[in-house]
Amino acid sequence: MIKKIFGALIFLSLSTALAFAVDDVPLPEVILTGLQAYSMKGPEAALNAWTKGGPLENDPKVLGSVRVFQEVEKYYGRYNGYNLIRQKKLAPNSKLIYLQMNYEKGPLFIRFLCYFSGDQWVVSGRLVLNTEPDEVLN
């Protein structure tokens, strides 16, 4: 009986660890290009890179997100890099990507809906970003 309980606990522990593991799949080029543009040229360049080739390209509502990044920089300071939280595969050609963008005084959480369109990944849904993780990581 004890062996069965112990075995079940090990199985549950391993299952839980695998469920929350960040996969080793590289980030899509569109995400990396936007992050590099952000660090070198600022939020407008990042948003242009993230939306290039997707349905949100040249959408004025998306470019309105520049103000959000400017507010974050105003209160949180300079951008210092990012951490991948996780990639969640929805289907063979779509996935959600969750990142933590790091600033001097705190993080910004961001979620991208990416779609494999022909031969490349594009950002195909609105960007969800907030300094509160619960607003993004659902």
Regions found by a protein language model. Give the residues of each.
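Positively charged n-region of N-terminal signal peptides that target proteins for export
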Residues: 1-4
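Sec-dependent N-terminal signal peptides
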Residues: 6-10
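Short, low-complexity N-terminal intrinsically disordered segments enriched in polar/charged residues
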Residues: 12, 17-40
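Exposed beta-sheet edge and beta->alpha loop/turn motif
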Residues: 86-138
